[in-house]
Amino acid sequence: MLPASLLRHPGLRRLMLQARTYAEAAAAPAPAAGPGQMSFTFASPTQVFFDSANVKQVDVPTLTGAFGILASHVPTLQVLRPGLVVVHTEDGTTTKYFVSSGSVTVNADSSVQLLAEEAVTLDMLDLGAARANLEKAQSELSGAADEAARAEIQIRIEANEALVKALE
């Protein structure tokens, strides 16, 4: 329950009273995958990479560790950490993406939704720039003014370490 002090704010009250509506495409149920198939949707705020595509396997980096997802995987919801998402398609091709964060949902019907805060193909990234950003962040860590600044720098370090690892 929200604290009463927040409810007195006119903007918040108006926000809480708004009716929620959905786009037709979002309200339509996802097509179920056939036996032994997995329906995969992968998107970022700026781009849709896969839209209910049948794929063989998806490898994802999560806060609890990296794992592969196949058809009939146990349902789960995981938070993504910076790292590589590897998609193995039915025709045998493999595509690698770098994600900064996000979530992955595996459903009982073998449908998988991966929503990334940021996602790019590896060919869009520069190893030299990632190394330079990593070195800069590491040098700034000791001079962090407070815990908040230190936490922000640590996040930059982790993201750039994952970038360097993905590109090497």
UniProtKB/Swiss-Prot annotation:
Q: What Gene Ontology biological process does one annotation of this record name? A: mitochondrial proton-transporting ATP synthase complex assembly
Record-listed N6-succinyllysine modification sites: 136, 165
Which terms does the record give in the GO molecular function aspect? proton transmembrane transporter activity; proton-transporting ATP synthase activity, rotational mechanism; structural molecule activity
Write out the entry's keywords from A to Z. Answer: Acetylation, ATP synthesis, CF(1), Hydrogen ion transport, Ion transport, Membrane, Mitochondrion, Mitochondrion inner membrane, Transit peptide, Transport
Transit peptide location on this chain: 1-22
Alphabetical list of Pfam families matching this protein: ATP-synt_DE_N (PF02823), ATPD_C_metazoa (PF21335)
The entry's cellular-component GO terms read: mitochondrial envelope; mitochondrial inner membrane; mitochondrion; proton-transporting ATP synthase complex
Q: Where does the protein end up? A: Mitochondrion; Mitochondrion inner membrane
The source's domain of life comes to Eukaryota
UniProt modified residues of type N6-acetyllysine = 136, 165
Q: Give TM regions.
A: none
Question: Subunit notes for this chain?
Answer: Component of the ATP synthase complex composed at least of ATP5F1A/subunit alpha, ATP5F1B/subunit beta, ATP5MC1/subunit c (homooctomer), MT-ATP6/subunit a, MT-ATP8/subunit 8, ATP5ME/subunit e, ATP5MF/subunit f, ATP5MG/subunit g, ATP5MK/subunit k, ATP5MJ/subunit j, ATP5F1C/subunit gamma, ATP5F1D/subunit delta, ATP5F1E/subunit epsilon, ATP5PF/subunit F6, ATP5PB/subunit b, ATP5PD/subunit d, ATP5PO/subunit OSCP.
Similarity comment: Belongs to the ATPase epsilon chain family.
Known function: Subunit delta, of the mitochondrial membrane ATP synthase complex (F(1)F(0) ATP synthase or Complex V) that produces ATP from ADP in the presence of a proton gradient across the membrane which is generated by electron transport complexes of the respiratory chain. ATP synthase complex consist of a soluble F(1) head domain - the catalytic core - and a membrane F(1) domain - the membrane proton channel. These two domains are linked by a central stalk rotating inside the F(1) region and a stationary peripheral stalk.
What's the protein called, per UniProt?
ATP synthase F(1) complex subunit delta, mitochondrial
